[in-house]
Amino acid sequence: MSPTRARSTTHADAIAQGFDQVLWLFGNQQYATEAGASNFFVVWRTKEGGLELVTAGLENKTILEGITRRSVIELVNARKDDAQSWTVDGTNLEPLTVVERDFSIDEIRETVAEGRLVEAFASGTAYFIAPVRHIRHREADVAIPREKGDSGHYAALIKGWLSDIVYGRSSFSGWTKVVKETS
């Protein structure tokens, strides 16, 4: 899947306007929930300087608990204190703190305006991680930063972690089991 362009509208309208997915917003607060049928994540710097991986929480039941979402959260939490895990293409990255909570499109726009948004991506079983590069909300365009071409460093790193586990290049906490062939 190519980098995702998300828009807060109907799916058919989004496709007609050149977007790949809809960023679903919930309630009057317009909380970001999912991108299509995928879980949505943002990486942003807090006003205090911390670096967070933020995704909608499960308590309001506005999103599905996707297995890839859970995998992303587990991997980031497990590798938080392992500095060697946070390198992609020779770039050392600052570890992320996972935050599961409601967050609004207005917060996303604020972090962009203040230069605190690092990147955004969607997670799903079919494609693991797809970077989000653009959101249109109420006819205003929100450009999502990407430091690594079409992807952000964190999206590329997490996608690499998942790929390595799926294809047997590394293991993680009992996620995989080798099944021996019998003749």
Can you say where each PLM-predicted feature lies in the sequence?
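Helix-start/capping segments and mature chain N-termini
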Residues: M1-S183
